[in-house]
Amino acid sequence: MVVLYQGCTGDNVRVIQEALGIDVDGIFGPITEHFVKEYQKNKGLWADGIVGPKTWTML
């Protein structure tokens, strides 16, 4: 499983953005990180803005 964080780009980032319901551009920038953190908080995960195995599973 791919770990994604700010600065990453590509199709996996697009998948995350689509799942979060935000604009899809394939760039994991500050906006994507913000929404990842919000998602993680809402799901009771550690809100670090990094999409690792636990966040992938929840998405």
Residue ranges and their predicted role:
Residues 33-34, 56:
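Short, well-ordered surface patches within globular domains
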Residues 1, 58-59:
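Intrinsically disordered, low-complexity Ser/Thr-rich linker and spacer segments
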